[in-house]
Amino acid sequence: MLMGLAVSDQPEGPYRDLRTPWFDPGYSTIDGHLFVDADGTPWLYFSRNGRRDGYDYGTIYGVRLSDDLLSPVGEPVMLLEADQHWELEIRDWNRCNEGPAVWRDGDRYVMTYSANHFMYTGYGIGVARASHPLGPWTKDPANPLAASNPAIGVSGPGHNSVVLSPDGTERFMVYHAHADPAAPSADRVVYIDRLQRDPVSGWWRLHGPTRSPQPAPKG
């Protein structure tokens, strides 16, 4: 599986295919995330997924892109792999980091990502940070950022995008979780919850998952 690149003059489309495949590094690539830094430099983050030694794996890579977005500049660099305890609960058959989303927070870069198998109740979202787009990246020791909560009917929160409120003062995570917690599958429902920075550690915290009404975004 390889990624493609499509463009449009409007977010809602229509989109036209610009390049398919985008590029071929010689392995399967999914979950592409485009991040443009404050200086205009474009970066691509994606997941490499496959199978080795009897288990499925996923690792997160990053690479700088040409200014026209058409080609990688240099070779992709591996940034994250499953290495925290919560990411290795099913290590005998799955060791996965995938679904990266990156944004800039002052002089730091923040990445939110998914870990474990997408149909497993332990599928969740972690957070890491770095001082350069290609790392080294450090994971929050307090991960996961988002996890299943059977008490309120939330199972397997994963993948995500991070967006600002209309007035730019709040961050929100848009992510999905299993539609039926009693029978986890590829069917999902969408959640939106607030992110806030811990004033002591500097790490971002998710106020969720929630299933009750929340205050509207500011602005």
Regions from the PLM with identified roles:
Residues 1-219:
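Carbohydrate-active catalytic/glycan-binding domains of CAZyme proteins
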